[in-house]
Amino acid sequence: MLQTFPRVAKCVRAYSSKPTLGPKFQSLDEIKEYIFKDTISANEFLTQSERAKDRELPVPPRETVLKLLKLSGLPTKGADIERIQRNLSEQISFINILHDTDLDDSLNVKYARLLPRENATLSYGDLIVRANSGKNSELAEISGSWDSTSRASMRKDGYFIVREEFLDNRD
């Protein structure tokens, strides 16, 4: 059995828009614990009546869960099949409720995004002006502040090769 996993790291969600890397996994048990840990339940988004409908749905059979685990590359031995069956049932119920939800067709779908979609169209002249205007220091766009290929001294087939030891001691 492997003792360390040097290239596997935890991705921890700390209520921010950017994920952060946690410490490396040290054992296979840590990886299993992280993968099988419940993070969010679809029931949090359902009303009481929708949760009641959820209990009426059949639970996926054990054979189906085992096939899904094999397809996803997760271990079947030691897996909590009953918990996975409950989670799959909740997720299927949630998807069914989303499909059955009536939508208001009078709403414009382009406003259903986090960011506004009212972008002004750019002409060729606008693009040329922006390209020639240089970097905006207010947006932290400083010319020459970052060279993406500075650590790559070798090339092969038109690609730069960055050695891993150069990535460890970056400034």
From Swiss-Prot:
Its main location: mitochondrion. Its EC number is 6.3.5.-. It is a peripheral membrane protein. Pfam families: GatF. One of its GO terms (molecular function) is glutaminyl-tRNA synthase (glutamine-hydrolyzing) activity. GO terms for biological process: glutaminyl-tRNAGln biosynthesis via transamidation; mitochondrial translation. It catalyses: L-glutamyl-tRNA(Gln) + L-glutamine + ATP + H2O = L-glutaminyl-tRNA(Gln) + L-glutamate + ADP + phosphate + H(+). Allows the formation of correctly charged Gln-tRNA(Gln) through the transamidation of misacylated Glu-tRNA(Gln) in the mitochondria. The reaction takes place in the presence of glutamine and ATP through an activated gamma-phospho-Glu-tRNA(Gln). Required for proper protein synthesis within the mitochondrion. Belongs to the GatF family. This is Glutamyl-tRNA(Gln) amidotransferase subunit F, mitochondrial. It comes from Zygosaccharomyces rouxii (strain ATCC 2623 / CBS 732 / NBRC 1130 / NCYC 568 / NRRL Y-229).
